């Protein structure tokens, strides 16, 4: 890309703290994701359209998008087949990521219940027994640990089972379950659906685009109502179900005089121990000896959301702020587990004093100081990691340190249980507010950052438009962090809402945007939607609700979008998925699915137009329910 087309810091992000760090990076000659994006332009149009196939070694094959050249791959696969297969593989990868996260959480729970992981303990006993009851496990004449062992075995069976249903799907409305069964997309077992994705997309197996995509919906349901939901539930049992609390966000949470430890990734199994170790008197004494006034843990991405929701641990930023946190020059250790971690951090941390510490047996990166984390010695390993950060504090180069002042208060911790508790124990007050028109509907806005969209621009503007029009927003993941940075997660943000929503928020003392957790915690939104639908005796697809992922980028987001739509929620995507090379697949996703499962996708990069689509949909559902 020519120098004259290079984006300025202000064009890359709407967040002022990020703009400051982007300018610092440019001044210091430090490369960021935005620079690498510009180096990639123009991006491969075949890849963008989804019409390149590498599924066998006769290829790669690509289809002419204009219909003037090659119309089939060597095996005879058309654009429809190739696009559908590629999309299915994206769903498989996304579902695998969430579900493997869940597997590790359950295995940790199992080790804890067997006395093999002494650093962990049950923090929500009520949820333990509630979940056990759901799985048909009697607690009579059994110790808590015996119940936990049985529950762990039952949850693990959801991964390997060959016949369905996955038990958590029973939380969905009866009409939705019946529809899934009639369509043949009721998920049977988490691992089975993912394996079948890979089998179907092997050369010479499934070659009907609609048939392929229906299995994609089934696989995504094994994520949303399986892996993700199991992860959320068992993490609540282990670490506590979130309740409303206050904290702070953005790069300004980093400290000038404390040891800064960033936890980044997605699994709270590690970060819970890091938070605990940072309060260890021995390590605090060592920090003082090294010249620091304490130890400051801050999060990035969903590991950050997990500790934020349960402990009020501050968050330094979103996916696209991970490099910027290091560029402050004030981070002693960047501690990572899995998912959404840029391999660029290896080279970047080498430009500063920051230790880049990888901990997962599944994920290593260039330039890391590897400190593999195992549940059996969880706290001891966490102490070693924090100790390494503390000992690195004297190496901080003050000439390179520049921490933006920007930080914003936020109110978080709105699990489904916390929301229902705030409503008096049932969704009835929420339903009354919707029926009366004070709240027009619910907007679920989630997802990643993407350098193709100005950082946080899509997230913040879409959400502002929704609340202005009396739509209560529930949020997770990087959208939640972006909204927090923009000051939308405080009760005072009700001033930006329409009069109806404003009145509800002021009466309850809540923000107009409710932080429900990490990306796996979108399952909390499904639970809440089901509770409302069941109270009304309708399907989720009948509710005045809509979803959006304004800046999505990961394969996990593809799986999320598929299971949200499969659950009956119209969903707007802010970046274009690689499907436009097939008119048939595009038409099915944006129109055809509505007649099949009661919801569909729309693609709209402009957040204001995306909000209009969601508001139009919500208004249509209100009219269908007889609401004004």
From Swiss-Prot:
Example of a GO MF term: anaerobic carbon-monoxide dehydrogenase activity
Amino acids binding [Ni-4Fe-5S] cluster: 266, 302, 340, 448, 478, 519
Source organism superkingdom: Archaea
Biological process terms in GO annotation: generation of precursor metabolites and energy; nitric oxide catabolic process; response to hydrogen peroxide
UniProt keyword list: 4Fe-4S, Iron, Iron-sulfur, Metal-binding, Nickel, Oxidoreductase
Ranges that cross the membrane: none
Residues annotated as binding [4Fe-4S] cluster 2: 53, 56, 61, 75
SUPFAM superfamilies per the UniProt record, alphabetical: Prismane protein-like
Annotated EC: 1.2.7.4
InterPro entries: CO_DH_a-bundle (IPR016101), CODH (IPR010047), HCP/CODH (IPR004137), Prismane-like_a/b-sand (IPR016099), Prismane-like_sf (IPR011254)
Similarity comment text for this entry: Belongs to the Ni-containing carbon monoxide dehydrogenase family.
Protein name: Carbon monoxide dehydrogenase 1
Source organism of the structure: Methanosarcina acetivorans (strain ATCC 35395 / DSM 2834 / JCM 12185 / C2A)
Phylogenetic lineage: Archaea, Methanobacteriati, Methanobacteriota, Stenosarchaea group, Methanomicrobia
Gene name tied to this protein: cooS1
């Amino acid at each position: 890309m020519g120098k004259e087309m290079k984006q300025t810091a202000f064009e890359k992000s709407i967040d002022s703290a990020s703009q400051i760090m982007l300018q610092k990076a440019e001044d210091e000659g430090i490369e960021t994701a935005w620079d690498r994006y510009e180096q990639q332009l123009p991006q491969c149009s075949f890849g963008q359209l989804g019409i390149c196939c590498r599924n066998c070694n006769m290829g790669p094959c690509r289809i002419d998008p204009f219909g003037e050249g090659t119309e089939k791959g060597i095996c005879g696969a058309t654009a429809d087949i190739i696009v559908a297969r590629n999309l299915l593989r994206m769903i498989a990868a996304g579902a695998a990521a969430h579900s493997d996260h869940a597997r590790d959480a359950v295995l940790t729970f199992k080790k804890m219940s067997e006395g093999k992981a002494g650093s962990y303990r049950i923090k929500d006993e009520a949820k333990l027994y509630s979940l056990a009851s759901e799985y048909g496990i009697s607690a009579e004449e059994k110790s808590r640990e015996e119940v936990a062992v049985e529950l762990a075995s039952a949850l693990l069976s959801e991964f390997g089972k060959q016949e369905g249903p996955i038990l958590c799907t029973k939380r969905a409305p009866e009409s939705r379950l019946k529809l899934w069964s009639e369509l043949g997309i009721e998920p049977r077992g988490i691992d089975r659906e993912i394996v079948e994705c890979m089998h179907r997309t092997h050369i010479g197996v499934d070659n009907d685009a609609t048939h392929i995509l229906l299995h994609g919906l089934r696989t995504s349901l094994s994520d949303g109502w399986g892996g993700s939901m199991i992860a959320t539930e068992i993490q609540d049992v282990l670490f506590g179900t979130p309740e409303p609390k206050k904290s702070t966000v953005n790069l300004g949470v980093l400290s000038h005089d404390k040891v800064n430890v960033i936890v980044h990734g997605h699994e709270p199994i590690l970060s819970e121990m890091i938070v605990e170790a940072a309060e260890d008197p021995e390590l605090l004494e060592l920090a003082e000896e090294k010249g620091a006034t304490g130890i400051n843990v801050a999060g990035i991405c969903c590991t950050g959301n997990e500790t934020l929701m349960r402990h009020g641990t501050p968050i330094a930023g979103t996916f696209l702020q991970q490099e910027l946190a290091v560029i402050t020059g004030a981070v002693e250790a960047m501690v990572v587990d899995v998912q959404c971690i840029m391999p660029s951090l290896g080279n970047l941390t080498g430009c500063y004093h920051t230790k880049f510490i990888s901990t997962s047996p599944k994920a290593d990166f260039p330039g890391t100081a590897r400190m593999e984390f195992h549940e059996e010695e969880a706290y001891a390993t966490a102490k070693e990691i924090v100790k390494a950060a503390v000992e690195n504090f004297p190496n901080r180069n003050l000439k390179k340190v520049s921490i933006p002042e920007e930080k914003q208060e936020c109110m978080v911790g709105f699990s489904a249980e916390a929301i229902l508790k705030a409503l008096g124990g049932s969704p009835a007050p929420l339903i009354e507010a919707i029926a009366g028109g004070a709240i027009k509907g619910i907007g679920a806005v989630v997802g990643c950052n993407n350098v193709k969209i100005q950082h946080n621009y899509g997230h913040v503007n879409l959400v502002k438009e929704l609340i202005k029009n009396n739509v209560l927003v529930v949020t997770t993941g990087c959208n939640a962090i972006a909204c927090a940075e923009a000051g939308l997660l405080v009760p005072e943000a009700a001033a930006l809402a329409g009069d109806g929503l404003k009145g509800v928020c002021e009466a309850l003392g809540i923000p107009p945007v409710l932080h429900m957790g990490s990306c796996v915690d979108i399952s909390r939104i499904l639970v809440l939607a089901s509770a409302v639908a069941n109270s009304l005796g309708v399907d989720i697809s009948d509710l005045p609700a809509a979803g959006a992922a304004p800046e999505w980028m990961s394969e996990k987001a593809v799986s999320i979008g598929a299971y949200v739509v499969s659950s009956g929620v119209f969903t707007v995507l802010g970046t274009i998925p690689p499907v436009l090379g097939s008119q048939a697949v595009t038409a099915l996703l944006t129109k055809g699915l509505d007649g099949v499962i009661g919801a569909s996708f729309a693609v709209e990069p402009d957040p204001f137009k995306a909000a209009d689509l969601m508001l139009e949909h919500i208004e249509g559902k209100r009219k269908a329910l007889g609401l004004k």
